[in-house]
Amino acid sequence: MKIKEVIEALERFAPLPLQESWDNAGLQVGLTEAEVSGALLCLDVTERIVDEAAQKGCNLIVSHHPLIFRKLSRLTGEDYVQRCMMKALAQGIVILSLHTNMDNAKGGVNYKIAEKMGLTDVRFMSAKEMNGVEYGSGVVGCFAEPLAADDFIILLKRVFGVECVQANELLRRPIRTVAICGGSGSFLLDDAANAGIDAFVTGEMHYHEYFGREQQIQIAVIGHYQSEQFTSEIFREIIENSCEGVKCFIADTCTNPIMYF
């Protein structure tokens, strides 16, 4: 199977037109006519990721975050983006990113988070349609049984493997309905609060968004990387279901640049 056929399978699931206007999802580096030798699946592309792909015999890297966000005027290796590109090109490695198109796709990033949390009746917060394809930013789901706020925080720590959750004052009412936005979700908080949803889970939140939300909605911020860590599982499921015989590996390299001490 050619690399371009694997890309086509991934982009059937998360079509590029679903990405936000500011995004740069899609093919980042390389030529796609070669036979695919393997795919390395990751959240971010770093030099260590390119090295891992080469070590595992993969000539395709599928990332969530695009390697290239800003316009390039030269290719000299002066920053990590350029070094990753040069290293990948030298080794014949193609880089593909599925970013906000995967966030906005049905069954995408936010659906996977909801699945990990055990939510049911999962749906887009505000569904849209493009060429017969339903999509949207953020999802809403519910627990089969309501949780006390402190138990909700414990659940998040367990599911996402975090030692702490950034939150506002704990709700005194049970939590049943939950809105989710992987990555940075400040832009959806008002929609969730106005809809009467009990809790909002995201990876990042602007400081001033916390004010005035006491006992209105439970804000729970788990970290950008942590909120999207399961995205590679979606990539793997698509490839295994649509690209028979293609080897794929979830990267061993942790690319989270944020550390806590």
Question: Predicted segments — roles?
Answer:
Residues 1-261:
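Hydrophobic structural segments
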